[in-house]
Amino acid sequence: MNQPELSYYGTGRRKSSVARVTLKHGNGQFKINNRVAKEYLKSDILIKDALQPLSITNTVSEFNIRVNAHGGGISGQAGAIRLGIARALLKVSADYRPGLKVAGMLTRDARAKERKKFGLRKARRARQFSKR
Protein backbone atom coordinates (compact mmCIF):
# COMPACT_ATOMS: atom_id res chain seq x y z
CA MET A 1 0.00 0.00 0.00
CA ASN A 2 1.27 3.52 -0.79
CA GLN A 3 2.25 5.62 2.17
CA PRO A 4 1.15 9.27 2.15
CA GLU A 5 4.02 11.65 1.41
CA LEU A 6 5.36 13.33 4.56
CA SER A 7 4.71 17.04 4.73
CA TYR A 8 5.94 19.53 7.30
CA TYR A 9 3.89 22.58 8.24
CA GLY A 10 4.92 25.97 9.63
CA THR A 11 3.17 29.30 10.12
CA GLY A 12 4.94 32.64 9.85
CA ARG A 13 3.72 36.16 10.56
CA ARG A 14 5.24 39.57 9.81
CA LYS A 15 3.48 42.96 10.14
CA SER A 16 -0.06 42.10 8.99
CA SER A 17 0.99 39.21 6.72
CA VAL A 18 0.39 35.54 7.46
CA ALA A 19 2.05 32.67 5.57
CA ARG A 20 1.12 29.01 5.92
CA VAL A 21 4.07 26.96 4.63
CA THR A 22 4.12 23.28 3.66
CA LEU A 23 7.42 21.49 2.96
CA LYS A 24 7.54 18.17 1.12
CA HIS A 25 10.61 16.24 -0.01
CA GLY A 26 11.22 17.06 -3.66
CA ASN A 27 13.40 18.97 -6.09
CA GLY A 28 13.14 22.59 -4.91
CA GLN A 29 9.87 23.87 -6.41
CA PHE A 30 8.69 27.07 -4.71
CA LYS A 31 5.06 28.12 -5.17
CA ILE A 32 3.22 30.96 -3.44
CA ASN A 33 -0.60 31.03 -3.76
CA ASN A 34 -0.35 28.50 -6.64
CA ARG A 35 2.00 30.80 -8.58
CA VAL A 36 5.74 30.41 -9.16
CA ALA A 37 7.65 32.39 -6.51
CA LYS A 38 9.53 34.50 -9.08
CA GLU A 39 6.22 35.55 -10.61
CA TYR A 40 4.64 36.36 -7.23
CA LEU A 41 7.48 38.11 -5.37
CA LYS A 42 9.10 39.55 -8.54
CA SER A 43 12.28 40.68 -6.70
CA ASP A 44 15.24 38.28 -6.43
CA ILE A 45 16.16 39.92 -3.12
CA LEU A 46 12.78 39.01 -1.60
CA ILE A 47 13.04 35.43 -2.90
CA LYS A 48 16.55 35.11 -1.46
CA ASP A 49 15.25 36.55 1.85
CA ALA A 50 12.34 34.08 1.95
CA LEU A 51 14.63 31.10 1.21
CA GLN A 52 17.31 32.10 3.74
CA PRO A 53 16.46 29.29 6.23
CA LEU A 54 16.99 26.70 3.48
CA SER A 55 20.37 28.15 2.49
CA ILE A 56 21.49 28.20 6.15
CA THR A 57 20.60 24.51 6.53
CA ASN A 58 21.93 23.59 3.03
CA THR A 59 18.57 22.12 1.97
CA VAL A 60 17.66 24.46 -0.92
CA SER A 61 16.91 21.74 -3.49
CA GLU A 62 15.67 19.06 -1.06
CA PHE A 63 12.13 20.35 -0.50
CA ASN A 64 9.16 21.48 -2.54
CA ILE A 65 7.60 24.51 -0.87
CA ARG A 66 3.93 25.46 -1.10
CA VAL A 67 2.85 28.69 0.57
CA ASN A 68 -0.52 30.26 1.21
CA ALA A 69 0.19 33.93 1.98
CA HIS A 70 -2.28 36.73 2.63
CA GLY A 71 -2.41 40.17 4.21
CA GLY A 72 0.07 43.03 4.12
CA GLY A 73 2.47 43.74 1.28
CA ILE A 74 4.99 41.69 -0.64
CA SER A 75 7.90 42.48 1.71
CA GLY A 76 5.90 41.52 4.80
CA GLN A 77 4.77 38.32 3.12
CA ALA A 78 8.40 37.43 2.27
CA GLY A 79 9.30 37.86 5.96
CA ALA A 80 6.33 35.72 7.00
CA ILE A 81 7.34 33.01 4.50
CA ARG A 82 10.89 33.03 5.91
CA LEU A 83 9.63 32.42 9.46
CA GLY A 84 7.19 29.75 8.24
CA ILE A 85 9.94 27.87 6.39
CA ALA A 86 12.23 28.03 9.44
CA ARG A 87 9.49 26.66 11.71
CA ALA A 88 8.68 23.88 9.24
CA LEU A 89 12.38 22.91 9.03
CA LEU A 90 12.41 22.38 12.81
CA LYS A 91 9.72 19.72 12.35
CA VAL A 92 11.90 18.03 9.71
CA SER A 93 14.87 17.79 12.07
CA ALA A 94 15.73 19.36 15.42
CA ASP A 95 19.40 19.43 14.30
CA TYR A 96 18.65 22.57 12.27
CA ARG A 97 17.72 24.56 15.40
CA PRO A 98 21.18 25.91 16.46
CA GLY A 99 22.05 27.28 13.01
CA LEU A 100 18.62 28.87 12.52
CA LYS A 101 18.63 30.29 16.05
CA VAL A 102 22.05 31.96 15.62
CA ALA A 103 20.93 33.49 12.30
CA GLY A 104 17.77 34.86 13.97
CA MET A 105 15.39 32.91 11.73
CA LEU A 106 13.22 31.63 14.59
CA THR A 107 12.44 35.05 16.08
CA ARG A 108 9.14 36.67 15.11
CA ASP A 109 9.77 40.30 14.11
CA ALA A 110 7.27 42.08 16.35
CA ARG A 111 7.60 45.50 14.71
CA ALA A 112 4.28 46.73 13.35
CA LYS A 113 2.71 50.04 12.34
CA GLU A 114 2.00 52.25 15.35
CA ARG A 115 -1.60 53.42 15.65
CA LYS A 116 -2.60 57.01 14.95
CA LYS A 117 -3.49 59.02 18.04
CA PHE A 118 -6.30 61.56 18.07
CA GLY A 119 -5.16 65.19 18.13
CA LEU A 120 -2.12 64.31 16.02
CA ARG A 121 -1.63 64.06 12.26
CA LYS A 122 -0.03 60.61 12.38
CA ALA A 123 1.17 58.27 15.13
CA ARG A 124 3.61 60.88 16.51
CA ARG A 125 3.55 63.80 14.05
CA ALA A 126 1.93 66.83 15.67
CA ARG A 127 0.75 70.02 14.02
CA GLN A 128 3.40 72.70 13.60
CA PHE A 129 3.73 74.82 16.73
CA SER A 130 4.09 78.60 16.44
CA LYS A 131 5.23 80.47 19.53
CA ARG A 132 4.17 83.88 18.18
From Swiss-Prot:
Transmembrane segments: none
Biological-process GO terms, alphabetical: translation
GO cellular component: cytosolic small ribosomal subunit
Pfam families: Ribosomal_S9 (PF00380)
GO molecular function, one term: RNA binding
Ribonucleoprotein among keywords: yes
UniProt keyword terms in alphabetical order: Ribonucleoprotein, Ribosomal protein
Domain of life of the source: Bacteria
Keyword Amino-acid biosynthesis recorded: no
Protein name: Small ribosomal subunit protein uS9
Gene: rpsI
